[in-house]
Amino acid sequence: MLSTKIDAENAENAAEIEMQFAVKAVEQAQIYWSLLEMRKGSELKLTKYDDEIFEDLINTFPEFKDPKTASFVNEDEMKSAKGKAAWRPFLMRYEKKVDDYNFGTLLRIKNTDEYEQETTIFVPRMQFLAYEIARNRYGLNDWIKKD
């Protein structure tokens, strides 16, 4: 039995666990990209809560009323102490609604990029959903669909 508590926020993950998360994140990215190739993003529904998530996003972060905000992720800003404090309440509102709401997911930095190591960042699933739902609503992912 452990005599000290483990701080999950600061604990170092075993390499195997990190690899499993990375594999899942890549699989999810490949599936999402395939969906975008088959159907315009503006026609996709990612969850049954898309309308609520989008409305909550623009109410919580009014800058998302401008499609340009959804087109680019400022990783430094998002992952700063101020950014984390702003996003945390948004994420937590979906803890009991969206499965794996905090699971690590790959998000494209720019909506004009494909999924590549240099063009993606690792974020909680709810941040991915917030950005991608907004991108889809604004038609920013429609270019991906193959004819």
From Swiss-Prot:
GO terms for cellular component: cytosol; nucleus. It comes from the Eukaryota. It is found in: Cytoplasm; Nucleus. InterPro entries: PBDC1-like_dom_sf, PBDC1_metazoa/fungi, Polysacc_synth_dom. The keyword Aminoacyl-tRNA synthetase does not apply. Keywords: Cytoplasm, Nucleus. Its main location: cytoplasm. PANTHER family: PROTEIN PBDC1. This is Protein PBDC1 homolog. It comes from Schizosaccharomyces pombe (strain 972 / ATCC 24843) (Fission yeast).
